[in-house]
Design a protein with these regions (language model features):
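Conserved redox-active cysteine motifs that mediate thiol-disulfide chemistry
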Residues: 64, 72-89
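Structural microenvironment flanking redox-active thiols in thiol-disulfide oxidoreductases
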Residues: 81-120, 130-137
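Thiol/disulfide oxidoreductase modules built on the thioredoxin-like
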Residues: 115-123, 128-179
Length: 179
């Protein structure tokens, strides 16, 4: 009887520890964020030049004077797939207001990215970081990651994970208003 009680107690403690570790991981990766959250950044954005899905090039520094949302994503990434309609709505809404989106796909073939873009009706610029050079130099660790860059070329916010339409619109409006 004592052995059974001890075994049950050990099992309960193990379950409690696993639950606490799981909750801590969830809070770190996906939870604990409110609509206002996001890492605030100060330094100048690192320039990059990447090929686009259409065959041209896009260079970040040439967009100076515009508010820019750089979104690192992948076709395999569920939160990335879920936020693409949000990105398209934001692009449609703000593109005439001195705003641009660069969706930087990381390490996927041009064909896979093109199929994804066509299937989802995306019209904003899609850049291909097939070697993940920009991804690494910007010290991005998770997909999706979005960086909001002001008109002077300084990143103001970085958000890791999928974003709501409300968040995207609010942060773009902040960039455009200069606040």
């Amino acid at each position: 009887m004592k052995k059974q009680t001890l075994l049950l107690l050990r099992g309960a403690i193990l379950l409690l520890l696993c639950s606490a570790a799981g909750y801590a991981l969830y809070q770190h990766v996906a939870g604990g964020r409110n609509e206002q959250a996001g890492t605030v950044l100060q330094q100048q954005a690192l320039n990059f030049r990447l090929s686009t899905l259409e065959g041209g090039d896009i260079e970040l520094k040439k967009l100076r004077g515009k508010a820019v949302l750089v979104n690192f994503w992948g076709t395999f990434c569920t939160p990335c797939k879920e936020e693409m309609p949000v990105m398209q709505k934001a692009y449609d809404r703000f593109k005439g207001d001195g705003f641009e989106i660069i969706a930087v796909n990381v390490r996927e073939s041009k064909g896979a990215v093109k199929r994804f873009v066509e299937r989802h009706g995306l019209t904003f610029p899609v850049a291909l970081d097939q070697s993940a050079e920009v991804y690494r130099s910007w010290e991005i660790y998770y997909l999706p990651t979005s960086i909001f860059i002001n008109r002077e070329g300084r990143p103001e916010r970085m958000y890791v994970g999928g974003m709501s339409e409300r968040q995207v619109d609010m942060w773009i409006e902040d960039l455009l208003s200069g606040s």
